[in-house]
Amino acid sequence: MNATDIERCRKRIIQYIWDPEPKNDEEPGSPIWCLGTRYPPQCVEETADESRNPDHGQQQNTNTSAPGWPEAFLLDFESKIWMTYRSNFPPIPKDAGQEGSLSLTLGVRLRSQLIDAQGFTSDTGWGCMIRSGQSLLANSMAILLLGRDWRRGERLEEEGKLLSLFADSPHAPFSIHSFVKHGADFCGKHPGEWFGPTATARCIQGLAARYDQSNLQVYIADDNSDVHQDKFMSVSRDEKGTVRPTLILLGLRLGIDRITAVYWNGLKAVLQLPQSVGIAGGRPSASHYFVAVQGSHFFYLDPHNTRPALRYSESGTYTEDEVNTYHTRRLRRLNIQDMDPSMLIGFLIRDEDDWEDWKARIMSLEGKPIITILSESDAASWKGRREALDEVEAFDDLDVAL
């Protein structure tokens, strides 16, 4: 067992033994921003339904209220689609001789040899970045399909059809099986290995292109934090020149071991933009899906909960209990000082007006930028760039495992 395995086990033990739900007492006077929607501090109310289980599929303390949080924020938070580890799904074939690979953690190697001898039937211990990426993609598609103001419990039939695209089956276009296959074919990632932000972004791009009905283009910034307008337009425009819904993905490293303080305000601003669809990654050795920020604290959905696999349903027909496993009211937060600097940031551009609005907002942000929009992609546009963004790096999946 190496140092990484030991540290991961230590964190998991601490979380299981002592993981109280946060109270709104750290920065109660600060507004909360959830994917571009602002919840002012003066709207703080008691939780409306204290009988609701905040973390469906898990046993919780009988006191399930969320002390001091705005009810409107809680309704928004629990409406986000939450992807987690799953178990007992159809086997994902292993590569020959992979059991002894050092790229697999000790726990994954043991499970591979003792339980999943014929193939991986659970992604517990290795699929957290994939699940975080699925969360980012699913919520982007939910905004397109259901609207940003959609709330849990509404339009159940359409939500079921969306969830079916992410079911734990080789038949689902955005399943764990599809991510792993694309990762093996095009990203040099093998079953049971961690995916970094870059591989996850490439999988999202490839799978979305393969599934025509997604109505979603994907643009990946392939050099640092620069978004080249001409390249973006070549991806987003159709043959008539109309800008189609496009997901912008940026894999960044905002420091070495921690996020450099000069980028704190820029990262906080990401979740305040109306085009934001969240941040995947952002915690050492464990990926989360960050959707909200209050002051210096980021709220996230944690994929490190193993639930039964979701069966594939072509019609999208699921029971209430099955749908409930994709939502939680249970808040978790992390101070920006404790976040890992490697992450995948997403923005959803719905049309040309949205693109112009996003550009204007990015260019007007104060402080050191973490994103730059270039009007041309020639060499002249790079003048002065290294001085302006000397610590923002494109993320290389080989640097760190999430």
Curated annotation (Swiss-Prot):
Name of the protein this chain belongs to: Cysteine protease atg4
GO terms for biological process, alphabetical: aggrephagy; autophagosome assembly; mitophagy; piecemeal microautophagy of the nucleus; protein processing; protein targeting to membrane; protein transport
Biased composition (Polar residues): 56-66
Active site, UniProt feature: C128 (nucleophile), D302, H304
Originating species: Emericella nidulans (strain FGSC A4 / ATCC 38163 / CBS 112.46 / NRRL 194 / M139)
Family: Belongs to the peptidase C54 family.
GO cellular component, one term: phagophore assembly site
Compartment(s) where it occurs, according to its Swiss-Prot or TrEMBL record: Cytoplasm; Nucleus; Preautophagosomal structure
Keyword Hydrolase: yes
Reactions performed catalytically: [protein]-C-terminal L-amino acid-glycyl-phosphatidylethanolamide + H2O = [protein]-C-terminal L-amino acid-glycine + a 1,2-diacyl-sn-glycero-3-phosphoethanolamine
Keywords: Autophagy, Cytoplasm, Hydrolase, Nucleus, Protease, Protein transport, Thiol protease, Transport
